[in-house]
């Protein structure tokens, strides 16, 4: 697969076109940002870990019945994926109160919910990704009702799979963010990544944070947390 021109660069990844119009190459960076880009830094080795963790989990999710954009891992940092049109919604699943949820509603972190919650935010940098509901999403023509229903179904399937998989590694899945895309024929697939950048992982016994919160909150040992997640999940 030949990497051609760069067609996009985001906070954590670059995307390149290929000779196949239906495929692109994603290259993961070590750059880290938080608080809507106000805090910036580098987490050494993060790109490679996020790439390999995402590919492993998406491969397993495909087997579990959740379609994804994953095609083939090229190298430790680069992966071939299906070219999709991203649905401009961030889908947040929460199993335990933490982060912005705890702050927004004035509750302590660590409250285990009776059932997972789902939130949507509108992917719009100028508006700082505001929270919206499914009625807003349909009214703004960000997605149809059928697409929203499909996205919700897949998001909860991902949650069930990740909770079980991570529990076997001694990790509690607190919350996480997903993004979905549409292929050329309109099929909804899981896109973006599943990694310590997009999930909150707590050690099941100690509660130690094993994710980007260590960067956000200046907790130290950021690289070590990413490496520990790779060790537990990937055996690396």
Region annotations inferred by a language model:
Residues 142-174:
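A long amphipathic alpha-helix within ATP-dependent nucleotide-binding catalytic cores
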Residues 28-37, 117-145:
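Residues forming anionic-ligand binding surfaces in small-molecule and nucleic-acid pockets
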Residues 111, 116-128, 159-170, 195-200:
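Phosphate-binding core of ATP-grasp and ATP-grasp-like enzymes
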Residues 194-236:
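C-terminal helix-cap and adjacent tail motif
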Residues 2-121, 233:
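Active-site loop/lid in soluble adenylation, ligation, and acyl-transfer enzymes
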């Amino acid at each position: 697969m030949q990497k051609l021109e760069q067609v996009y660069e985001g906070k954590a990844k670059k995307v390149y076109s290929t000779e196949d119009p239906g495929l692109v190459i994603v290259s993961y960076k070590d750059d880290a940002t938080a608080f809507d880009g106000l805090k910036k830094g580098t987490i050494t080795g993060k790109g490679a870990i996020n790439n390999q963790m995402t590919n492993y989990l998406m491969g397993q999710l495909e087997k579990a019945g959740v379609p994804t954009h994953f095609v083939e891992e090229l190298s430790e940092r680069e992966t071939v994926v299906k070219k999709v049109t991203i649905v401009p919604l961030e889908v947040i699943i929460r199993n335990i109160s933490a982060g912005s949820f705890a702050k927004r509603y004035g509750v302590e972190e660590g409250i285990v919910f009776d059932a997972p919650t789902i939130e949507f935010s509108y992917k719009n940098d100028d508006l700082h990704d505001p929270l919206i509901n499914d009625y807003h999403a349909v009214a703004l023509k960000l997605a149809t009702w059928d697409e929203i229903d499909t996205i919700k179904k897949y998001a909860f399937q991902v949650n069930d799979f990740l909770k079980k998989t991570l529990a076997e590694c001694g990790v509690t899945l607190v919350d996480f963010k997903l993004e979905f895309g549409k292929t050329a024929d309109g099929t909804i697939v899981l896109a973006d990544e599943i990694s310590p950048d997009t999930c909150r992982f707590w050690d099941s016994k100690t509660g130690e944070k094993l994710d980007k919160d260590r960067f956000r909150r200046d907790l130290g040992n950021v690289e070590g947390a990413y490496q520990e997640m790779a060790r537990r999940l990937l055996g690396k």
